[in-house]
Amino acid sequence: MANNTLHRYLFEDLSVRGELVQLDDAYQQIISSKEYPKPVQNLLGELLVATTLLTATLKFEGSITLQLQGNGPVSLVVINGDNDQKVRGVARFEGEIADDATLHQLMGKGYLVITISPKDGERYQGVVALEGKDLAECFEGYFERSEQLKTRLWLRLGEFEGKPHAAGMLLQVMPDGTGSSDDFEHLEQLTDTVKNEELFSLEAEDVLYRLYNQDKVQLFEPQNVEFFCGCSRERSGGAIITIERSEVDDIIATEGKVSLHCDYCGTSYDFDSIDVAHLFEEATKGNDTVH
């Protein structure tokens, strides 16, 4: 099957649109950057699926960042995705976490922060209290309040062929106002029957046929979803030269090197005294050229 793909579709006679995302490698790369407990892996997976589904609604170049913030053992979960479906994510946690911990046990009193950042235009940010029984319910509440559109999400995590998989579906009434609540409930009931194994193993066309073969469904071209953190040695060097040279020299005197670690992909970039001298020398040359 085609993994790491997002599919959009439309129910031609019912004024309802849908999305289906199936992820394996993109999800696995995010959770492999640290030794995350299983419940934290699941939170990252659910937020990743939700981010992918939401970025599909963007009608412009830009990005969406979803953050879970709380005062529980998990203080932060962040997923960022853009209109090209390049995604990355990280989580912060402390202490022992029970394998069966719920969303509220993990996050404590928490919030879902949704930040939409167009390439051109003003940034939008919405904050939603984590009041639903699960993450999908929190997102549904957000859509109902912010867009006044009936929306349902299904966020699924699990193992398939020995590897972690993540998948999800979204149904939303079209904003033209012609969709009926009965039609939407009919599609909800059908989608509720989808099994994890089907989402992890079947092609999108087969999943949709299994669920909606009595309805007319228009399936659009899929979009690939790709893990992309954006870190590089050059960017890390650029960060070092923003620090006072004396502070950098003190670190090298103590540690023997300056190390920068990318939380998104787990890569570390090390700079010794020769590297640092070269960085500051090049920065000085650049400043002289400007003046």
Curated annotation (Swiss-Prot):
Question: Is Acetylation given among the entry's keywords?
Answer: no
Post-translational modification note = Under oxidizing conditions two disulfide bonds are formed involving the reactive cysteines. Under reducing conditions zinc is bound to the reactive cysteines and the protein is inactive.
Annotated Gene Ontology cellular components are:
cytoplasm
InterPro entries per record: Heat_shock_Hsp33, Heat_shock_Hsp33_C, Heat_shock_Hsp33_N, Hsp33_helix_hairpin_bin_dom_sf
Give UniProt keywords alphabetically: Chaperone, Cytoplasm, Disulfide bond, Redox-active center, Stress response, Zinc
One annotated GO molecular function is: unfolded protein binding
* Signal peptide residues on this chain, from the entry's feature table: none
Disulfide bonding pattern of the chain: 229-231, 262-265
* Domain of life where this protein originates: Bacteria
State the Gene Ontology BP annotations. protein refolding
| Primary site of residence | cytoplasm
One Pfam entry name:
HSP33
Compartmental location = Cytoplasm
- What does the function comment of this entry state? Redox regulated molecular chaperone. Protects both thermally unfolding and oxidatively damaged proteins from irreversible aggregation. Plays an important role in the bacterial defense system toward oxidative stress.
The record's comment on protein family reads:
Belongs to the HSP33 family.
Cite the NCBIfam families for this sequence.
Answer: PRK00114.1
- The protein, known as: 33 kDa chaperonin
Its source organism is: Aliivibrio salmonicida (strain LFI1238) (Vibrio salmonicida (strain LFI1238))
Lineage of the source organism?
Answer: Bacteria, Pseudomonadati, Pseudomonadota, Gammaproteobacteria, Vibrionales
